[in-house]
Structures are given as C-alpha cells and as structure tokens.
A protein has these predicted regions:
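Flexible, compositionally biased loop and terminal segments
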Residues: 1-117
C-alpha cells in the first residue's frame, strides 16, 4: 500500500503528507547528535536539523492531533517548534473531510509569528 501510494503521488506538488511509522522524536534527536559527534562537527542547531530523519522535508506548518489528547506524544518534537497545532476531540477514524476543511480555514486565518512576541 505504501509503495503504491508513493508512486501514485510522486509528482504531486501542492500538499505533502508524511507518515511516521515506528517513529520516536527523542530517538531521532539522539541519533542526530550521535551522527554529529561521529562527523566531528560543531553541535549547532543547523547541524542537528541536517541530521534529523526529516532533513530533506520542510518542517510542518500545521499538525492535527486527534483523539482528545493535548500532547505531541514524542512526534516531531524538534520540527514542530513553530507549527500551528490543532487538537481535535474526535478519534482518527471519525475525523471527516469537513473537519479537515474547518481546520484549514482556521489555519489560513492565523497570523503566524514563528516564536516572536
């Protein structure tokens, strides 16, 4: 299924969806730091970012967390620093296209400040 989905959407340009299977952000960060140590380069924000699993994709602008849980659960802890996060009470199987469009509409109307006050 995943290989077929990847082939089918390979030329799509407008929306990027990333699936994280058996993924843990804390392990990813430790792995990045160990790679930096092995390369004997400075431990900088940029070098950490370059050694994350997600180094070849942009940080998410928007995260949607379903299931009435207000936490990231070890998901993209580094990359989500300036993401807008929407928490939805519904469980994933009950999340609808209408729910998605409501969130997108709210997201479009946000003034993003990327950490600035």
């Amino acid at each position: 299924i995943l290989n077929n989905s990847e082939k089918t959407t390979a030329n799509n340009k407008k929306l990027q969806i990333n699936l994280a299977l058996n993924y843990g952000s804390r392990n990813e960060i430790v792995n990045a730091i160990n790679l930096i140590k092995k390369k004997k380069v400075s431990l900088t924000l940029r070098n950490i970012e370059k050694n994350l699993y997600t180094s070849n994709i942009p940080d998410p602008d928007l995260l949607i967390r379903t299931g009435n849980t207000h936490r990231l659960s070890n998901f993209l802890l580094w990359q989500a620093a300036y993401s807008e996060i929407f928490f939805v009470k519904k469980l994933w199987p009950d999340f609808t296209v209408s729910d998605y469009y409501k969130i997108l509409n709210n997201f479009r109307n946000l003034k993003r400040n990327f950490g600035a006050l």
